[in-house]
A protein has these predicted regions:
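C-terminal alpha-helical cap of glycosyltransferases
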Residues: 387-402
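Conserved donor-nucleotide binding/catalytic region of nucleotide-linked donor-dependent transferases
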Residues: 346, 351, 356-380, 386, ...
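Catalytic donor nucleotide-activated moiety binding site of glycosyltransferases and closely related
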Residues: 250-287
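Short amphipathic alpha-helix
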Residues: 15-26, 40
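A short, glycine/small-residue-rich beta-strand->loop->alpha-helix junction that serves as a flexible
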Residues: 6-19, 241-245
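Nucleotide-sugar-dependent glycosyltransferase catalytic domains
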Residues: 2-3, 30-33, 37-261, 397, ...
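A donor-sugar binding/catalytic signature common to diverse glycosyltransferases
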Residues: 119, 289-338
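Short beta->alpha connector loops at strand-helix junctions that form conserved
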Residues: 52-60, 143-144, 308, 325-329, ...
Length: 402
């Protein structure tokens, strides 16, 4: 019996993509322990998988919310400072090292007692680096997002810096300084994973040719029911709580409101977005929601306006719903590039946001709607094809060989 230990980020967007994989492990007779958020234990009512909480300090670190901002420039500064402000970057590295030490102290002995045959970690869980050095078994990454090439190897990152980061935050450190900091951080990773598995396929992965050979695309599978008769626009920027995204969401809705279509906006439980949206003056065709059934909304909406988060994008592709992508961070910008390149939507590039550019993108989607819908369907078909060819079975084969 294989003993498998998984350590995931404690968010739904990082847990649910791995659900089918975790169930396959159990079906193949593995003993599975998952560190994430214990509330997901309900997904395994028979108790055949243990889902455990991280220490409180780690959960708080992962769930950190940015402070509320009323000034748009200050909100942008806070959002981009993790990458573009050398002082903030240094402070975040210190905090990250503190969390790494805490993980070793809190769970080092527990993990040693588990003595796993195979270890899986979330690709975004930087607080696991020191603990991973103590785990003496094959290690694999599970990537719920898109693969990001080393920034100094990426041609796309320079475009992102010029189009999004610098224009949103002109006080940013230089492009070369950012690359220098990223190289320095990469040298700290003393135990790279043996392989990294992502729920992607080539059409959805920007700069695939710049990824290491150890990055493996698994594809993805969803059972959705795209509706033939569609109407309206669905707008969301996910559930992350920060003010910069709240302002982008409000500006996006203001730009689209004159189109006359019914516009449904989800603020995803983000209190900052709720405050900004409920104080805004929108016409009657704009409908605000804390949460929605996103699958149903995507199946019935004509257009999805998104920040480019991979979970919502995959759902939109399987719903055959074309997208307008308005990214903030680099992975979402990559997703937007892939969506636009394969004719499943349009990427909005100008910052500050240009209402006319957003409206023109929306008009463009509607003018050639069948073509864009076909592009989304083609990307979904490739994801499905890759899942059937590789998918969870490929990961299990890696476990068997470990």
């Amino acid at each position: 019996m294989k003993k498998i230990l998984c350590m995931l980020m404690p968010y739904g967007g990082h847990f649910y993509p791995n659900l089918e994989l975790l169930r396959l492990f159990v079906q193949r007779g593995a003993q599975v322990v998952v560190y994430c958020d214990a509330k997901y234990q309900e997904c395994f009512p028979e108790g055949d998988i243990q889902v455990r909480d991280y220490p409180t300090a780690i959960r708080e670190y992962c769930g950190h919310m940015a402070s509320a901002q009323t000034d748009r420039k200050r909100a942008a500064r806070e959002y981009f400072s993790y990458m573009a402000d050398a002082r903030i970057y240094a402070l975040m590295q210190i905090e990250d090292l503190t969390m790494n030490r805490m993980m070793v102290e809190a769970l080092g002995a527990e993990v040693a007692d588990l003595n796993p045959d195979v270890f899986f970690c979330d690709a975004q869980a930087s607080f696991l680096a020191q603990l991973r050095e103590q785990i003496d078994c094959p290690q694999f990454e599970l990537n719920a997002s898109t693969f990001v090439p080393a920034l100094w190897r990426s041609q796309r990152f320079q475009q992102y810096y010029q189009e999004i980061l610098w224009t949103s935050y002109p006080d940013s450190i230089s492009f070369d300084q950012i690359l220098s900091l990223q190289r320095k951080r990469a040298r700290r990773d003393k135990r790279p994973p043996d392989r990294s598995f992502g729920y992607l396929s080539p059409l959805l992965q920007d700069e695939a040719e710049r990824l290491p050979a150890t990055d493996q695309m698994l594809g993805f599978h969803l059972e959705l029911h795209p509706q033939a008769q569609r109407a309206g626009v669905y707008v969301s920027r996910g559930t992350v709580c920060e003010s910069y995204g709240a302002f982008l969401l409000e500006e996006t809705v203001q730009a689209l409101a004159p189109c006359g279509e019914s516009i449904h906006v989800s603020w995803g439980g983000n209190p900052y977005s709720k405050q900004v949206l409920t104080q805004a003056d929108f016409p009657e065709n704009v409908h605000l929601h804390a949460y929605v059934n996103q699958i149903k909304m995507l199946e019935n909406s004509k257009v999805f306006v998104t920040h480019g988060g991979i979970t919502g994008v995959r759902e939109a592709l399987f719903a055959h719903t074309p997208m307008v992508v308005i990214p903030a961070n680099f992975p979402d910008y990559q997703v937007g590039q892939a969506i636009e390149a394969h004719h499943a939507g349009i990427l909005i590039r100008n910052r500050p946001l240009d209402a006319e550019e957003i409206r023109e993108g929306y008009v463009e989607l509607n003018r050639y709607y069948e073509d864009y819908q076909a592009g989304a369907a083609a990307m979904a078909a490739e994801l499905e094809s890759y899942w059937n060819a590789y998918g969870a079975e490929l990961v299990w084969k890696a476990c068997e060989l470990a």
